[in-house]
């Protein structure tokens, strides 16, 4: 038996999806039975994710970064993310930082907590020290979803934060965004100041 996995949860029901409707429209009887059964399974998973996410307290900031490299070692990005996390929490911000936020969720699905944080956070920081880290599967999964949310909520802000690379090496989706160079002295203070302007925590 196949069990669907959800890594891009939405508030919209799968049965309302246009592609799903087309698939049902053109399916034969046996295919239709399979599609409807799988849609029902996805619907149940979605309801479970939404139930958990609705009980989560809202976040101010979501830190998006690559935790480990190809050899399983901790990345420079994770060290920078950790420093930023501690500075922001000292300033009174509620921050989603996977290494700490999800550490007591071992053995559980992370998606409900990521989904809740993406939807509530007013600011996302995308940390990267290599172009390929910005486009790593899980990193891109998070920031691409956040960009989509920004289209419907103009109060949300995404700040790309880069180091040891040029700004033009950032993903083209970030071309219209103001990026932060983490190689500059005092970059964390600059980030905190920028976030305070958005969230008004003075």
Label the predicted regions:
Residues 141-145:
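Glycine-rich, phosphate-binding/catalytic loops in enzymes
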Residues 12-127, 147-157, 185-202:
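Conserved N-terminal substructure of TIR/SEFIR domains
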Residues 179-183:
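Short acidic-hydrophobic, aromatic-tinged amphipathic segments that line or gate anion-handling sites
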Residues 76-78, 133-140:
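Active-site-adjacent loop/helix micro-motif of nuclease/hydrolase catalytic cores
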Residues 2, 130-131, 161-167:
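Short beta-alpha junction loops
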Residues 165-177:
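Glycine-rich, charge-decorated loop segments at or immediately adjacent to ligand/cofactor-binding or catalytic sites
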Residues 70, 104, 133-134, 167-168:
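Flexible, glycine-rich phosphate/dinucleotide-binding loops
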């Amino acid at each position: 038996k196949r069990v669907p996995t959800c890594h891009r949860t939405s508030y919209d029901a799968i049965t309302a999806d246009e592609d799903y409707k087309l698939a049902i429209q053109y399916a034969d009887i046996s295919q239709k039975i399979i599609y409807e059964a799988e849609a029902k399974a996805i619907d149940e998973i979605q309801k479970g994710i939404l139930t958990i996410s609705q009980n989560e307290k809202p976040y101010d900031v979501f830190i998006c970064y690559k935790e480990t490299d190809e050899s399983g070692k901790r990345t420079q990005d994770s060290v920078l993310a950790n420093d930023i996390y501690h500075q922001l929490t000292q300033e009174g911000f509620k921050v989603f930082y996977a290494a700490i936020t999800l550490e007591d969720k071992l053995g559980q699905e992370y998606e409900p907590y990521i989904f809740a944080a993406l939807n509530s956070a007013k600011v996302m920081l995308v940390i990267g020290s290599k172009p390929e880290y910005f486009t790593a599967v899980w990193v891109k999964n998070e920031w691409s979803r956040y960009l989509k949310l920004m289209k419907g909520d103009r109060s949300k802000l995404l700040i790309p934060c880069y180091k040891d690379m040029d700004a033009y090496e950032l993903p083209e989706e970030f071309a219209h965004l103001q990026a932060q160079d983490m190689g500059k002295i005092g970059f964390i203070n600059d980030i905190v100041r920028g976030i305070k302007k958005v969230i008004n925590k003075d």
